[in-house]
UniProtKB/Swiss-Prot annotation:
Its main location: membrane. One of its GO terms (cellular component) is plasma membrane. It comes from the Bacteria. This is Membrane protein insertase YidC. Interacts with the Sec translocase complex via SecD. Specifically interacts with transmembrane segments of nascent integral membrane proteins during membrane integration. The keyword Heme does not apply. InterPro entries: Membr_insert_YidC, Membr_insert_YidC_N, YidC/ALB3/OXA1/COX18, YidC/Oxa/ALB_C, YidC_ALB_C, YidC_periplasmic_sf. GO terms for biological process: protein insertion into membrane; protein transport. Belongs to the OXA1/ALB3/YidC family. Type 1 subfamily. Required for the insertion and/or proper folding and/or complex formation of integral membrane proteins into the membrane. Involved in integration of membrane proteins that insert both dependently and independently of the Sec translocase complex, as well as at least some lipoproteins. Aids folding of multispanning membrane proteins. The keyword Cell inner membrane applies. The chain crosses the membrane at residues 5-25, 338-358, 362-382, 432-452, 482-502, 518-538.
Length: 585
């Protein structure tokens, strides 16, 4: 490995480490998850029922105005059980009060609820009356049919749940949910009658109020992914409440494709099927806590000339699985962070994820898929890396000659560069050739970092001693943090650093002995620092790629001969003298 190659690799590793600093097990059987989900749903329902009053104290006209008659009533709960979740919907607010996923567990392998506020719920409408009253439908009691029941649906079966709030004979609010047996997507339709002259600004908002609960053990890491977002005009708008005690807000006008609240692996996205007037995002981080609370809402117009306004929405509430959200045809996948749109995102979307999805049809273990993927990438880069290795061997053979040239022409830089160029050309070597394969792989490596860091495919999938390929494979936790290294020892990065050391040891180098000794230890150490906090899936990929590279290097070393080395000399070939032409015989 020549000086340019080593310098390039060192700079790349240093950039990766600095960038990281400033950026930041077996599954239970499905039946167990299902039973646990039902238990959690029943618990939520019991908690809500225990707080219910047969009739609330009548609300005053001053607080609710025209909505006062609906501010008291009896809360009734409906449970929906489909293939993917258990949901609880309440007649108070016609809101979703609980949704427990069946196929996903939290970091402690326990079921979790995607609705953080089981008492008030999350999905609602917000009105501002012309008198200045702020009305949240979660404070109002709706009527409906088939309430206080459990509905089970499978596959393509659907179930519609309807609520109605009558304010007067000519004024009402209707809300309808549509559930499908095999989908995380829930239909949410709103019909307003006779309200066009009663609302300030002739608009209302449909909102998801509440951050998604954190599901992973590393709350600080999850906080880096938590956010409220909107997609408008082909651009992603993010709201990140990163500082304690500070309120964050973002509001824009226009036709929004969706608004959403997410944590690291799950999302609640509101998708309008009609044109919107804009969106509003709000967020705040709790003091002394990594948890970030968010609100995301869509602004909808209520034209003064229309007596009845129908608006249709969908709520996607489930995992941030690329293939699943892509299939919604709503651009929700744009919220997934795959790095630079012009470089790493294409590698993630069109190379890594499709390859993993295809291989997963035949291989169920993602550890094996990563190893196969590393082997395939090695095959693709084999011709380039072989040519690079041979070029480095030639460079190593030329070092004595190059040193002699440097001494000979130390006072004539122009002549030195000319002679170096001639020798490189005659020997058929490229001084930068040793660094080229690594540089070409960097977009792929960075893309894999983003995929392994944020994709739910690897979450809670193990391999050998690794319990979860989406997090570091810690074998020892310190209980404190070492700067640049972390709070634990991960085994895969150590093995990977050993392979980096071995690869450098057997690779020809154009460095001096002192340079070689420094880089022989410094570069593996830098890679160890970088990968110790990386997802173990990424460390496994790089480990296996290095193993294949070491095997390739052994093969090249064993099949090379002296005839492969360049045959050049320091002195340039002398030019033949021109024969003087005579004027006579």
């Amino acid at each position: 490995m020549d000086r340019n190659s080593v310098t390039g690799l060192a700079l790349i590793a240093l950039i990766m480490i600095v960038w990281l600093q400033f950026m930041s097990p077996e599954k239970k059987p499905l039946q167990q998850v299902t039973d646990a989900g039902k238990a959690r749903t029943e618990q939520v329902a019991a908690e809500i029922n225990s707080d219910m009053q047969p009739a609330a104290v009548p609300a005053t006209e001053d607080s609710f105005g025209m909505f006062a008659p609906a501010a008291s009533g009896t809360e009734r709960l409906t449970v929906i059980d489909n293939d993917l979740f258990h949901a609880v919907v309440s007649s108070k607010g016609a809101t979703l009060k609980s949704l427990v996923l069946k196929k996903h567990l939290d970091g402690n392998l326990k079921p979790f609820d995607l609705v953080s506020d089981a008492k008030n719920g999350a999905l609602s409408m917000l009105f501002l009356t012309r008198e200045g009253r702020r009305i949240d439908t979660r404070d109002l009691y709706f009527a409906g049919s088939s309430l206080d029941t459990l509905h089970t649906i499978k596959g393509k079966e659907t179930y519609a749940l309807s609520y109605r709030l009558a304010l007067s004979p000519r004024q009402s609010i209707e809300v309808s949910y549509t559930f499908t047996g095999d989908s995380y997507r829930i239909g949410y339709d709103v019909k307003l009658t006779g309200l066009s002259g009663s609302l300030a600004g002739n608009e209302y908002q449909v909102q998801w109020d509440g951050g998604l609960p954190y599901t992973e053990k590393n709350r600080d890491d999850e906080a880096r992914s938590a956010q409220a977002s909107a997609y408008l005009g082909g651009s992603l708008v993010k709201l990140d409440a990163e500082k304690d005690g500070r309120s964050y807000r973002e509001e824009q006008s226009g036709d929004a494709r969706w608004v959403a609240v997410r944590n690291k692996y799950f999302i609640a996205a509101l998708i309008p099927e009609d044109r919107t007037a804009g969106f509003y995002l709000d967020g705040q981080k709790e003091r002394g806590n990594a948890y970030e609370n968010y609100l995301a809402s869509l602004k909808m117009e209520v034209p003064a000339s229309e007596e009845v306004v129908d608006s249709r929405f969908s709520l996607y509430l489930g995992p941030l699985d690329y293939n699943t959200v892509k299939a919604q045809h709503a651009d929700i996948e744009k919220i997934m962070d795959f790095g630079w749109d012009w470089l790493t995102r294409p590698f993630a979307e069109f190379v890594i994820l499709p390859a993993f999805t295809w291989m997963n049809r035949f291989v169920s273990n993602y550890g094996l898929i990563i190893i196969i993927f590393a082997f395939l990438i090695k095959l693709v880069t084999y011709p380039l890396s072989t040519a690079s290795t041979k070029s480095m061997k030639k460079m190593a053979a030329l070092q004595p000659m190059l040193k002699e040239l440097q001494d000979k022409y130390k006072d004539n830089p122009a002549k030195l560069q000319s002679e170096l160029g001639r020798i490189y050309k005659e020997a058929g070597v490229n001084p930068l050739g040793g660094c080229l394969p690594v540089v070409l792989q960097m977009p792929l490596l960075f893309a894999m970092f983003y995929v392994f860091r944020s994709s739910i495919q690897l979450r809670q999938h193990g391999f050998l001693w690794v319990k979860d390929l989406s997090v570091p494979d810690s074998i020892l936790d310190f209980g404190f943090t070492i700067p640049m290294y972390g709070s634990h020892i991960a085994l895969l990065p150590i093995l990977m650093a050993v392979t980096v050391f071995l690869q450098q040891k057997i690779t020809p180098t154009a460095q001096s002995n002192d340079q070689m000794k420094i880089m022989l230890y410094m570069f593996p150490a830098m890679m160890l620092l970088f990968f110790n906090n990386m997802p173990s899936g990424l460390a496994l990929y790089y480990l296996m790629f290095n193993v294949f590279s070491v095997a390739q290097q052994f093969y090249i070393n064993s099949t090379s001969s002296a005839a492969d080395l360049p045959q050049v000399s320091i002195s340039a070939p002398s030019r033949p003298k021109k024969k003087k032409s005579g004027s006579g015989k």
